[in-house]
Amino acid sequence: MNENTKVIKGRTGDWEMVLGLEVHAQVASKSKLFSGAAVGFGAGPNEQVSLVDAAMPGMLPVLNRFCVEQAVKTGLGLRAQINLKSRFDRKNYFYPDLPQGYQISQFDQPIVGEGVVSVERDDGTTFDVRIERLHLEQDAGKSLHDQDPNATYVDLNRAGTALMEIVSKPDMRTSEEAAAYVKKLRTILVYLGTCDGDMEKGNLRADVNVSVCRPGDYEKFRATGDFKHLGTRCEIKNVNSYRYIQQAIEYEARRQIEILEDGGKVDQETRLFDPTKGETRSMRSKEEAHDYRYFPDPDLLPLVLDPAWVKSIEETLPELPDAKKARLQSQYGLSAYDAGVLIIDADRADYFEAAAKGRDAKLVANWVTNELLAKLSAAGTEFTNSPLPHTDIAQLVELIENGTISSKIAKEVFEHMWAGEGRPAEIVEKRGLVQINDTGAIEKAIDDLIAGNPDKAEAVKDKPQALGWFVGQVMKATGGKANPGTVNELLRKKLGVE
Amino acid sequence: MSLTNLTLKAAIDGLAAREFTSVELTRAHIEAIEAARGLNAYILETPDKAIDMAAKSDARRALGEAGPLEGAPLGVKDLFCTNGVRTTACSKILENFVPTYESTVTSQLWRDGAVMLGKLNLDQFAMGSSNETSYFGPVTNPWRAQGSTKALTPGGSSGGSAAAVAADLCLGATATDTGGSIRQPAAFTGTVGIKPTYGRCSRWGVVAFASSLDQAGPIAKTVEDAALLLTSMSGHDPKDSTSLDIPVPDFTQFVGKSVKGLKIGIPKEYRVDNMPAEIEKLWQDGIAWLKEAGCEIVDISLPHTKYALPAYYIVAPAEASSNLARYDGMRYGLREEGANLTEIYENTRASGFGDEVKRRILIGTYVLSAGYYDAYYLKALKVRRRIAEDFDNAWTQCDAILTPTAPSAAFGLGENSNDPIAMYLNDVFTVTTNLAGLPGLSLPAGLDANGLPLGLQIIGKPLDEATVFSVAGAVEKAAGFTAKAEKWW
């Protein structure tokens, strides 16, 4: 049994949850999947709509090669099979924000097949989520129901935008794992440059499949692949934050358990998560489910990829998070945790690597992942927009390394750097923060201190832990600039502490 | 002789020889159209635009910039979107639709100097074989049986195109063919029509019926005229993913070319029950003519032919049911109000589509539905594959195939309109080429006992319109078909 499975206590015994996700990622592309219309956030309603997007009579789709390249790149990044032949199908249903009356999608021949994503839990352990498939499809427009009490407005700017639907197998067992998976997937997509990962704008959103079962059932499912061992699943549509994903799952699992414990049965259905109430509610049942009447889109030829083209894409793949993490650990001797924090986005890792050149890498990693990251997060910005260039962090660490300043002083210097007072060396110079390494000056301070406190100097011989008081006093007397190592060493000698 | 009696080729030659101007030629056609309104071939006349285009054409010619169709007035089937000119597909749902774009095919005609006379009637959304499903009423065939005044169908769906060409209301017309909609009307009106290889003509800007079957093509007075028009209409269009990126030859150079040594296949499966003896005889005449011209006649078998019509009437409605989903009253076209969204959809589509269109949407929706998809749609796709293989096999034995175009001559308006199956049977000889994507041409080859025209069909290999035109040219020459509908309108 997976020790990470969370047992949910019920009245009738223990339960576990089984989770699978369908993540919709908007393809980073300047134009739409089948029309030349621009893609962009913030344009006025219906300003980015071509004749094709509006489904005018006689208009035809033409596949955007760049979007295909992005999907292939993503597939390679998910260590998945690239299907050299795939097909586009029509998914038929009526809705005002779907101008064609069908969505062009890929039904039984997706462009990308099975793959795997390695995901880190918060405690640093990892688990694999198997990818079932990735397919390309068009997004719909937006229906605006809140503009007029008697009318719905439709904005077709998003209609026809390319989406990648990435379907996982039911390999997640806790809501934390589900969120961690989406985080990791997002990191990979952003590394690849195939999706901007902006969840607030809805450019990355998840449909979450939740079911519950008794302990042991999941293992039977994994051994046989037979879904009969699992409970009936409900699909929660369009959840667009990590927090909501977790909340929705927790609520939904509880809801299903209560139904089952009351002797009822879970209906397979599509549900919506209401973030204000923290609840899921029924959207449509299996009986009400649409018959989408999928069939091959006769306006488009089967998509056939040249293996050489796929290979050329593979050759241009950037270093992906897992590889980068392993390299940071081996090349710089970083801890798994620090490496994990640094690889969350590629810019962060790049910043670190630039700053670490010729410096104590672990020390640089500490400064980058602690002080600087905290400041940037508080300022709501990221490493690409850091007001402090990597050369400043490198210089700060150099000053520590060569003994010019102590780590403690460095923190003070850092505050001044962040306040925009200049480069670290200038600040140290200007503010007179250079460490006192002069033994004579420190010795004098120690001698004065012992002379003024003979009883304490006597007591410390039996109680060496009281040495700290002396250190503090010496530092105080030197304005914090005394080299702490030297202070310690001299104190021990003069006080006779081993 | 009136200017409207000229063939397209003769008219272009006359324009080139400065015997008359495009404005004169166009005006003669406008007058003929006005005098023939009883035929209901044009549902929209654009005389001002025509004269304007003709004047510009004359100006170009004066500058020595004449295109291959310079100054030739043509009619346009109202399935082709025309920029700023109402395009209805002869439906109520698009009754007032004015496109802001021009179909690729028509834009190529205008590029080559042609002049637009107006928009031609058709079966609603090209669904029909008699032009009777048009929201604007049926077209009347200019031909009548000898001694009869009974109104006959010009066939469909390109009934307006065929009637306009037959009645000299244009020098040629655009048409489309999904299951025979160019060739059957051509056969019923004594005109020439060709559906080229699927992908020859761009479908961009043509209101879609069944995307995998729809092809544009011309209806014309002679084989040479058809070749002239098809040359201009064809060509790769990056806006249509199914358009073929293959050079287009000048098809006219193949008309009149010797057919000596060509092998002509005669498929035994096209000898259907109850086929009129006159059609069988015409077929034999065609065989004899080609033999005389030096062709070798080969008996061939296309064993899956009998499944073609049922397969067609599954695939075409399936695609149509999806293609016509966009007519929902939301963005353009007819909108009928309702208490909620579903009612708006229901009211709009109930009111906007005619019965035949609704029938096909329902059939198409049914065959794609869960539980029926495999038995109908998927099976039909398999049949389609078998039919294409039949032709692949045939091409190992012959260079072109000769068949009748339609199982009867033009029938009376109203005669089949309550019997969809009888109506669908009109397509029995023509649907196979749509299913297999092959070029097919119909040309008039004789008259039946009532003096009504009958057509023969020549089917070619994929992209081998050249041979089709050569064979058609030979049959045309041998048949010496010169009959015209006697003017009564």
Swiss-Prot record, chain A:
Keywords, ordered alphabetically: ATP-binding, Ligase, Nucleotide-binding, Protein biosynthesis
Pfam family for this entry, one: GatB_Yqey
GO process annotations (BP): glutaminyl-tRNAGln biosynthesis via transamidation; translation
Protein function: Allows the formation of correctly charged Asn-tRNA(Asn) or Gln-tRNA(Gln) through the transamidation of misacylated Asp-tRNA(Asn) or Glu-tRNA(Gln) in organisms which lack either or both of asparaginyl-tRNA or glutaminyl-tRNA synthetases. The reaction takes place in the presence of glutamine and ATP through an activated phospho-Asp-tRNA(Asn) or phospho-Glu-tRNA(Gln).
Enzyme Commission number: 6.3.5.-
Protein family: Belongs to the GatB/GatE family. GatB subfamily.
Catalyses which reaction(s): L-glutamyl-tRNA(Gln) + L-glutamine + ATP + H2O = L-glutaminyl-tRNA(Gln) + L-glutamate + ADP + phosphate + H(+); L-aspartyl-tRNA(Asn) + L-glutamine + ATP + H2O = L-asparaginyl-tRNA(Asn) + L-glutamate + ADP + phosphate + 2 H(+)
UniProt-recorded name of the protein: Aspartyl/glutamyl-tRNA(Asn/Gln) amidotransferase subunit B
PANTHER family per the UniProt record, alphabetical: GLUTAMYL-TRNA GLN AMIDOTRANSFERASE SUBUNIT B MITOCHONDRIAL AND PROKARYOTIC PET112-RELATED, GLUTAMYL-TRNA(GLN) AMIDOTRANSFERASE SUBUNIT B, MITOCHONDRIAL
Assembly behavior: Heterotrimer of A, B and C subunits.
Swiss-Prot record, chain B:
Gene Ontology BP, a term: translation
InterPro entries listed in its UniProt record: Amidase, Amidase_CS, Amidase_dom, AS_sf, GatA
Record GO terms (molecular function): ATP binding; glutaminyl-tRNA synthase (glutamine-hydrolyzing) activity
Enzyme Commission number(s) from the entry: 6.3.5.7
One Pfam family linked to the record: Amidase
PANTHER family, per database record: GLUTAMYL-TRNA(GLN) AMIDOTRANSFERASE SUBUNIT A, TRANSAMIDASE
Function recorded in the entry: Allows the formation of correctly charged Gln-tRNA(Gln) through the transamidation of misacylated Glu-tRNA(Gln) in organisms which lack glutaminyl-tRNA synthetase. The reaction takes place in the presence of glutamine and ATP through an activated gamma-phospho-Glu-tRNA(Gln).
Name of this protein: Glutamyl-tRNA(Gln) amidotransferase subunit A
Source species of the chain: Caulobacter vibrioides (strain NA1000 / CB15N)
